[in-house]
Design a protein with these regions (language model features):
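Structural/interface elements that position substrates and couple domains in central-metabolism enzymes
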Residues: 1-236
Length: 236
């Protein structure tokens, strides 16, 4: 529950940074972890504790553990007649975090005509096929509501995801080929192979596409236009 709270509070801070303008939350985190209260200062190098991994903004936590554990502790506290306003807020804030996608789409995409969106990643984190409480589920709901034609790719969980949602999703095998005919590209899970988007952009193949990087996964300095990242106000 403590780790889940770290994720949520940094998501909220990153939302404030994005709406303030002129702020990149990645740079704020770099400054935070340079503080000796968050890192161990050696004679020649700084040792960064792994808890800092939970400072990175995104769509919110998912999987089989965090959602269940936070809810269980909240219910336990209620049974003790002990109010836990923080845990209650953690759950509510985490549920709202994917709305970042809806906000970006409504503000930056002409939705009058049907658009194609490629959602990259369906598992709740990379290196697993676990889709339980994956942010991709909420993202698909948002895209369906906006009448987008939804294409998805995931190295491990793609078929499982399609079968579980029972909605009109189109799975793709070669995302590097399909990305060229999309209007919108959204990174939902930070699989390493999706870093190739940076090279495709440099080659001029993605100039007219809206790219939504809800993991802050790509190097935002590369993009010149239509790139939207959580924790950054930069529409490059």
């Amino acid at each position: 529950s403590l780790l889940a709270t770290q994720i949520v509070i940094h998501n909220e801070f990153s939302n404030i940074a994005r709406k303030t303008g002129g702020i990149d939350y990645k740079e704020i985190i770099e400054g935070v972890v340079s503080d000796k209260r968050w890192s161990i200062q050696g004679s020649n190098e700084t040792f960064i504790p792994s808890i800092v991994d939970y400072f990175q903004p995104g769509y919110g936590y998912g999987g089989s553990c965090f959602p269940k554990d936070v809810k269980a502790l909240l219910e336990y506290s209620k049974g003790l007649d002990s109010k836990s306003l923080v845990l209650d807020s953690v759950i509510k804030s985490n549920d709202l975090q994917p709305l970042f996608v809806e906000e970006v789409l409504k503000e930056n995409v002409d939705l009058k005509d049907k658009k194609k969106i490629l959602i990259l990643g369906t598992s709740f984190k990379p290196e697993t096929d676990d889709i339980r409480e994956s942010s991709s589920i909420k993202i698909v709901e948002i895209c369906s509501k906006l009448n987008l034609e939804i294409y998805i790719h995931d190295p491990l969980s793609q078929e499982k995801f399609i079968d579980s949602l029972k909605t009109n999703l189109i799975g793709v095998k070669d995302w590097k080929k399909e990305i060229l005919i999309m209007d919108i590209v959204l990174i939902s899970t930070s699989w390493p192979e999706y870093k190739l988007i940076e090279e495709l952009y440099k080659e001029g193949l993605l100039d007219q596409k809206v790219i939504i990087d809800g993991r802050g996964f790509l190097d935002n300095k590369i993009f010149k236009n239509n790139y939207f990242s959580v924790g950054s106000s930069k529409n490059s």
